[in-house]
Amino acid sequence: MIFTLGINHHSAPLAIRERVAFGADKLPHALADLTRERPVREVAILSTCNRTEIYCSAESPDVVIDWLAHYHQVGREEIAPYIYTHDQPEAIRHAFRVASGLDSMVIGEPQILGQMKDAVRAAEENGTLGTQLHKLFQRSFSVAKEVRSTTAIGANIVSMAAAGVHLAERIFESIAGQRILFIGAGEMIELCAAHFCAGKPKQVTIANRTLERGRALAEQYGGTAIRLDELGEHLAQHDIVVSCTASPLPIIGLGMVERAIKTRRHRPIFMVDLAVPRDIEEEVGELDDVFLYTVDDLAQVVESGLESRQAAVVEAEDIIANRVKDFLGWLESRDTVPVIRSLRDSAERMRRHEIEHAMKLLAKGEAPEKVLEHLSHRLTNKFLHAPTQTLNSAEGGERADLQGAAARLFHLHAAD
């Protein structure tokens, strides 16, 4: 049975989501820990700014919920009210919707597809991706491609990066003339840098754990790079701060920002924290001269382009409904695999035995035509012995059922 369980921006606030997030470097250990000594056969973990989801093949989701709470050292009762669980067929539909961007904060955004592929790659590399989940995700990627190529779901999207620019322009008349500090150098920061730098800021600085990666991004926009441990020295020089790292703990604290505000003589700082868990301490937003926005704060802005895409959403849901039916058909066909494998193994044993017998006859000088005739008769009798015996011994309704099954299995047609 395929299950999906998780917490996302629909079900839980940021304060809860950040407590159960998984950094990319933690996934190998988490995957191994979940499948160790637990009745979980397959598992993949998708963890982004807006969701932490566990896709698994298991008997029940309860053991996974217990593990999630234990792994993150939180009480089950603290997170249980925010957790949603889906079994078949809803788990399949949910995976297809997530991959297609229908469950995202920004409806139709394409980044989630890459994030899901990363989650699948991590599961595959760590040996927790089996036949069912592999097929589920490959179908999810195929459905996402179909949705994007046949509907307008990706049109008129207001991205998180564009929303950040929109909010900044409420504080400052324009981006031009402002000094911007980007913290991190991942995909989200790259997107934000492209949007903000289109406004021709006065200065661009990239702060990153590895200076080389920071420099590579900074050079694209004529900026400079600094290390994360230099943030305290440089924060006061910037008017706009956009942060998105994978740090498990905040990297900008209240004290650091208070000192920066004092140095700036209370000129405002606009800050966007796109990280989960948060990069900037929540208390920073209470300072008078700081305008701090999180991923949840940007939700209303990114919804602005959704109305024009409602027709595309309906079309996408129809596509997904049909593909869910197809996948359920594949799952049902998997139920017959053990029987088919056993049937073929039995036939193969018979074949090998009769081939050995025939080879011995040929070695004794028997005529090949006679040996082939003998071989074909013996194979026919062996293959049909068990079903014939079962049909002959059946009675009443069982016999009628078996006769019908035999006719279907062997494509038999009754004589006129």
UniProtKB/Swiss-Prot annotation:
Q: Which CDD domains match?
A: NAD_bind_Glutamyl_tRNA_reduct
What keywords appear on the UniProt entry? NADP, Oxidoreductase, Porphyrin biosynthesis
Which InterPro entries would you find in this protein's record? Answer: 4pyrrol_synth_GluRdtase, 4pyrrol_synth_GluRdtase_dimer, 4pyrrol_synth_GluRdtase_N, GluRdtase_CS, GluRdtase_dimer_dom_sf, GluRdtase_N_sf, NAD(P)-bd_dom_sf, Shikm_DH/Glu-tRNA_Rdtase
Instruction: Report the GO molecular function annotations.
Output: glutamyl-tRNA reductase activity; NADP binding
Query: Which positions does UniProt annotate for substrate binding?
Result: 48-51, 104, 109-111, 115
Could you say which protein family the record assigns here?
A: Belongs to the glutamyl-tRNA reductase family.
**UniProt cross-references to PANTHER family, sorted A to Z:** GLUTAMYL-TRNA REDUCTASE
Instruction: Report the protein name in the record.
Output: Glutamyl-tRNA reductase
Source organism per UniProt: Dechloromonas aromatica (strain RCB)
> What's the encoding gene here?
hemA
